Amino acid sequence: VMNCASLDRGFGRCQVMRKQSTVLRKYANGTFDRLADAPVNEHGEPLRRFEALEADGISGAGERLEPGDVYINKQIPTNANDNSAVTMLNSAITYKNAPLSYKSPVEGYIDQVLISDTDSDQTLVKSLIRQTRRPELGDKFSSRHGQKGVIGLIVPQADMPFNDQGICPDIIMNPHGFPSRMTVGKMIEL
Protein backbone atom coordinates (compact mmCIF):
# COMPACT_ATOMS: atom_id res chain seq x y z
CA VAL A 1 0.00 0.00 0.00
CA MET A 2 1.51 3.35 -1.02
CA ASN A 3 0.61 6.91 -0.06
CA CYS A 4 -0.57 8.88 -3.13
CA ALA A 5 0.62 12.20 -1.66
CA SER A 6 4.13 10.76 -1.25
CA LEU A 7 4.12 9.68 -4.90
CA ASP A 8 3.05 13.21 -5.89
CA ARG A 9 6.05 14.59 -3.98
CA GLY A 10 8.46 12.31 -5.87
CA PHE A 11 8.71 9.16 -3.76
CA GLY A 12 9.80 6.03 -5.63
CA ARG A 13 10.68 7.64 -8.95
CA CYS A 14 13.01 5.74 -11.26
CA GLN A 15 15.10 6.64 -14.28
CA VAL A 16 14.82 4.46 -17.38
CA MET A 17 17.72 4.83 -19.83
CA ARG A 18 17.36 3.73 -23.46
CA LYS A 19 20.18 3.71 -25.99
CA GLN A 20 19.36 4.40 -29.65
CA SER A 21 21.97 4.33 -32.38
CA THR A 22 22.24 4.70 -36.14
CA VAL A 23 25.05 4.23 -38.63
CA LEU A 24 25.79 6.74 -41.39
CA ARG A 25 26.83 4.33 -44.13
CA LYS A 26 29.13 4.87 -47.09
CA TYR A 27 28.02 2.99 -50.19
CA ALA A 28 30.05 1.36 -52.98
CA ASN A 29 28.98 3.90 -55.61
CA GLY A 30 30.45 6.81 -53.64
CA THR A 31 27.23 8.01 -51.99
CA PHE A 32 26.76 8.22 -48.24
CA ASP A 33 24.12 8.87 -45.61
CA ARG A 34 24.03 12.38 -44.20
CA LEU A 35 22.52 14.43 -41.39
CA ALA A 36 20.30 17.37 -42.30
CA ASP A 37 19.09 20.32 -40.27
CA ALA A 38 15.42 20.74 -39.40
CA PRO A 39 12.95 21.66 -42.17
CA VAL A 40 11.36 25.09 -41.63
CA ASN A 41 7.92 26.56 -42.24
CA GLU A 42 7.15 29.77 -44.15
CA HIS A 43 8.19 31.90 -41.12
CA GLY A 44 11.62 30.28 -40.91
CA GLU A 45 10.82 28.32 -37.74
CA PRO A 46 11.49 24.56 -37.51
CA LEU A 47 8.49 22.26 -37.80
CA ARG A 48 7.10 21.11 -34.44
CA ARG A 49 8.39 17.53 -34.53
CA PHE A 50 11.88 18.80 -35.49
CA GLU A 51 12.19 21.43 -32.71
CA ALA A 52 14.64 19.35 -30.64
CA LEU A 53 17.23 19.27 -33.45
CA GLU A 54 20.31 21.46 -33.51
CA ALA A 55 22.00 22.80 -36.66
CA ASP A 56 23.91 19.53 -37.21
CA GLY A 57 20.72 17.43 -37.38
CA ILE A 58 21.18 15.79 -33.96
CA SER A 59 19.37 16.66 -30.73
CA GLY A 60 21.70 17.99 -28.04
CA ALA A 61 21.96 16.79 -24.46
CA GLY A 62 19.13 18.06 -22.27
CA GLU A 63 16.56 18.41 -25.06
CA ARG A 64 13.02 17.36 -24.17
CA LEU A 65 11.39 14.76 -26.44
CA GLU A 66 7.68 14.14 -26.80
CA PRO A 67 6.14 11.21 -28.71
CA GLY A 68 6.83 11.61 -32.43
CA ASP A 69 9.71 14.11 -32.07
CA VAL A 70 12.74 13.56 -34.33
CA TYR A 71 16.09 13.37 -32.52
CA ILE A 72 18.36 12.34 -35.43
CA ASN A 73 17.46 13.72 -38.87
CA LYS A 74 19.15 11.16 -41.12
CA GLN A 75 18.87 11.19 -44.91
CA ILE A 76 19.84 8.33 -47.22
CA PRO A 77 20.57 8.51 -50.96
CA THR A 78 17.76 7.22 -53.16
CA ASN A 79 20.16 5.43 -55.50
CA ALA A 80 22.48 3.87 -52.91
CA ASN A 81 22.32 0.44 -54.56
CA ASP A 82 23.25 1.75 -58.01
CA ASN A 83 26.75 0.51 -58.87
CA SER A 84 27.68 3.08 -61.52
CA ALA A 85 29.97 5.54 -59.76
CA VAL A 86 30.63 7.54 -62.95
CA THR A 87 26.99 8.53 -63.36
CA MET A 88 26.90 9.59 -59.72
CA LEU A 89 29.60 12.19 -60.33
CA ASN A 90 27.74 13.71 -63.28
CA SER A 91 24.25 13.86 -61.78
CA ALA A 92 22.94 15.43 -58.59
CA ILE A 93 22.44 13.01 -55.71
CA THR A 94 18.89 12.93 -54.34
CA TYR A 95 18.19 12.00 -50.73
CA LYS A 96 15.13 10.68 -48.94
CA ASN A 97 14.36 11.26 -45.27
CA ALA A 98 14.92 8.44 -42.77
CA PRO A 99 14.71 10.25 -39.40
CA LEU A 100 14.85 8.53 -36.02
CA SER A 101 11.82 9.60 -34.01
CA TYR A 102 10.94 9.12 -30.35
CA LYS A 103 8.31 6.38 -30.02
CA SER A 104 7.64 6.06 -26.29
CA PRO A 105 4.29 7.39 -24.97
CA VAL A 106 6.08 9.02 -21.99
CA GLU A 107 8.17 12.17 -22.47
CA GLY A 108 11.92 11.78 -22.27
CA TYR A 109 15.14 13.78 -22.31
CA ILE A 110 18.34 13.34 -24.30
CA ASP A 111 20.93 12.44 -21.66
CA GLN A 112 24.05 11.95 -23.80
CA VAL A 113 25.03 12.04 -27.48
CA LEU A 114 28.08 10.23 -28.83
CA ILE A 115 29.46 10.45 -32.37
CA SER A 116 32.20 7.97 -33.27
CA ASP A 117 33.58 5.90 -36.13
CA THR A 118 33.27 2.14 -36.51
CA ASP A 119 36.04 -0.25 -37.57
CA SER A 120 34.74 -0.12 -41.14
CA ASP A 121 35.16 3.70 -41.21
CA GLN A 122 31.45 4.50 -40.95
CA THR A 123 30.05 7.14 -38.62
CA LEU A 124 28.03 5.93 -35.63
CA VAL A 125 25.62 8.25 -33.77
CA LYS A 126 24.38 7.09 -30.34
CA SER A 127 21.78 8.85 -28.19
CA LEU A 128 21.00 7.95 -24.58
CA ILE A 129 17.39 8.87 -23.75
CA ARG A 130 16.25 9.22 -20.12
CA GLN A 131 12.69 8.82 -18.85
CA THR A 132 11.49 9.53 -15.32
CA ARG A 133 8.72 7.17 -14.30
CA ARG A 134 6.22 7.45 -11.47
CA PRO A 135 5.29 4.24 -9.58
CA GLU A 136 1.99 2.68 -10.59
CA LEU A 137 -0.05 -0.41 -9.70
CA GLY A 138 1.87 -3.61 -10.38
CA ASP A 139 5.37 -2.12 -10.05
CA LYS A 140 7.78 -4.20 -7.99
CA PHE A 141 9.78 -2.70 -5.12
CA SER A 142 12.55 -4.30 -3.11
CA SER A 143 14.48 -3.44 0.03
CA ARG A 144 18.20 -3.91 0.59
CA HIS A 145 17.41 -7.14 2.43
CA GLY A 146 15.70 -8.91 -0.47
CA GLN A 147 12.13 -8.30 0.68
CA LYS A 148 10.26 -7.65 -2.53
CA GLY A 149 6.67 -6.76 -3.08
CA VAL A 150 4.25 -5.42 -5.68
CA ILE A 151 2.19 -2.25 -5.36
CA GLY A 152 -1.36 -3.46 -4.84
CA LEU A 153 -3.04 -0.21 -3.80
CA ILE A 154 -2.34 3.52 -4.01
CA VAL A 155 -4.32 5.31 -1.31
CA PRO A 156 -4.99 9.05 -0.78
CA GLN A 157 -3.26 10.46 2.30
CA ALA A 158 -6.62 11.06 4.02
CA ASP A 159 -7.25 7.29 4.05
CA MET A 160 -3.80 6.34 5.42
CA PRO A 161 -3.23 5.65 9.13
CA PHE A 162 -1.49 8.35 11.16
CA ASN A 163 0.03 8.82 14.62
CA ASP A 164 -0.60 11.46 17.32
CA GLN A 165 1.55 14.03 15.52
CA GLY A 166 -0.36 13.45 12.24
CA ILE A 167 2.52 11.72 10.44
CA CYS A 168 1.44 9.28 7.71
CA PRO A 169 3.69 6.51 6.35
CA ASP A 170 4.86 6.55 2.74
CA ILE A 171 4.51 2.80 2.34
CA ILE A 172 2.87 -0.04 4.26
CA MET A 173 4.33 -3.53 3.84
CA ASN A 174 2.82 -6.84 4.91
CA PRO A 175 4.65 -7.97 8.09
CA HIS A 176 3.81 -11.67 7.69
CA GLY A 177 6.94 -12.28 5.60
CA PHE A 178 9.37 -11.52 8.42
CA PRO A 179 9.07 -14.72 10.54
CA SER A 180 9.60 -17.12 7.64
CA ARG A 181 12.29 -15.12 5.85
CA MET A 182 14.12 -14.08 9.03
CA THR A 183 15.42 -10.79 7.63
CA VAL A 184 16.30 -9.28 11.00
CA GLY A 185 18.32 -6.51 9.37
CA LYS A 186 15.15 -5.11 7.84
CA MET A 187 13.44 -5.02 11.23
CA ILE A 188 16.42 -3.10 12.66
CA GLU A 189 16.42 -0.73 9.68
CA LEU A 190 12.72 0.03 10.06
Predicted regions: what they are:
Residues V1-L190:
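Conduit-forming functional cores of very large proteins
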